[in-house]
Swiss-Prot record:
Entries under SMART domains matching the protein: TOPRIM
Lineage: Bacteria, Bacillati, Cyanobacteriota, Cyanophyceae, Synechococcales
UniProt xrefs under Gene3D superfamilies: 3.40.1360.10, 6.10.250.240, RecR Domain 1
Keyword Endoplasmic reticulum: no
A GO BP entry: DNA repair
Descriptive protein name: Recombination protein RecR
Record Pfam families: RecR_C, RecR_HhH, RecR_ZnF, Toprim_4
Organism in which the protein naturally occurs: Synechococcus sp. (strain CC9605)
Key words of the record: DNA damage, DNA recombination, DNA repair, Metal-binding, Zinc, Zinc-finger
Domain Toprim: 74-168
Entries under SUPFAM superfamilies matching the protein: Recombination protein RecR
Zinc finger (C4-type): 51-66
Length: 191
């Protein structure tokens, strides 16, 4: 049981207590259900790869988004990973294409632009006649570094913008940090 708990703890957002609860829950399930769970996990790992165009997770050579003829072709939204892409898709506000970088520039972790899918992004911009790139990267040192790098690299080819950052709905101004408030002021829009 300790091995199972240890494996669950390796998952993002799962602490020791949750890992133990998950392990106990699985051990109380019928053998057939545990086999189905294991089969689904193995099938996902072997059958799901990356879209050859945008690098989003896909069981096919091209993902659903890239195959969709109703998506706008001239706009690419750049994200760090598929989790960010899925979060944006849940809003149903963006109707263009995506490009998954595979991470963010982080010199402290030894991750430079050459380890990300930057070359592929530049190739897409020149091959697909992209007019705008929207950078939807995390508001962090790494996200800012990556945005600055990409902005400088891509501006000669197309319009480059970054999504606005500010206060989450329902939050109180007095509890917001200075950086968040500064960005909220910078990203203000007319009413």
């Amino acid at each position: 049981m300790a091995r199972l708990i240890d494996q669950f703890e390796r998952l993002p957002g799962i602490g020791p207590r949750t890992a133990q609860r998950l392990a106990l829950h699985l051990l109380n399930q019928p053998q057939e259900q545990i086999h189905q769970f294991a089969d689904a996990l193995l099938a996902a790992r072997t059958q799901v790869g990356q879209c050859q165009t945008c690098f989003h997770l896909s069981a096919d050579p091209e993902c659903e988004i890239c195959r969709n003829p109703e998506r706008r072709n001239g706009v690419i939204c750049v994200v760090a990973d598929s989790r960010d892409l899925l979060a944006l898709e849940r809003t149903r506000e963006f109707h263009g294409r995506y490009h998954v970088l595979g991470g963010l520039i982080s010199p402290m972790d030894g991750i430079g632009p050459e380890l990300l899918r930057v070359t592929e992004l530049v190739q897409r911009i020149s091959n697909e006649e992209i007019s705008e790139v929207i950078l939807a990267l995390t508001p962090s040192v790494e996200g800012d570094t990556t945005s600055l790098y990409l902005g400088r690299l891509l501006k000669p080819f197309c319009s480059v913008s970054r999504i606005a950052y500010g206060l989450p709905m329902g939050s109180e101004l007095e509890y917001a940090d200075e950086v968040t408030l500064s960005r909220a002021l910078e990203g203000r829009r007319p009413v």
